[in-house]
Amino acid sequence: DVKNEEILNDLLAVNNGTKSLTDVVGKTTPELTDQLAGKEMVSPFFDLKPVNGGIKNEEGKYVVTISVPSLTKAMTDVQILHYSTVRNLFELITPTSVDYEGKTITAVFEDLSPVAIIAKVDASKAADSTLGTSPKTGVASTWMVFFGAAVVLAGVSAVAYRKER
């Protein structure tokens, strides 16, 4: 939970697109702004909270696996931007594991607070990753032609049947 209202408003503004990530991070941790260059947010900021006390390693740090539905192989240098509410600073955390197939990221945290997933996104690979998933567009459908022909045939048959009677 973010106690600093200014930081909370800044994180919400980044999520809404009204503030840039580098401006917000630069306020408290200016040394990270260069490391954010060329990276995009893969997820909005969200709050990490331990479930049943969380899982800790032998050093007492939290081991967290995060589901990232938008994760694709077009993303490289995947990192977690973490705002520590305990230490009042942003930090970049390199995941211990990135599973593109399972769309999960595992990382180790000193404390749990708001995070956002960031990465370099290769637009050419991103375009290729959706190949075969979209329906064809601009293809004429013939079912209306057959329906129209059936209606005309039914009408002609009805007229011919009446003339015979």
Locate each region found by the language model.
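Short, solvent-exposed loop/turn segments in extracellular or other extracytoplasmic domains
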Residues: 59, 98-104
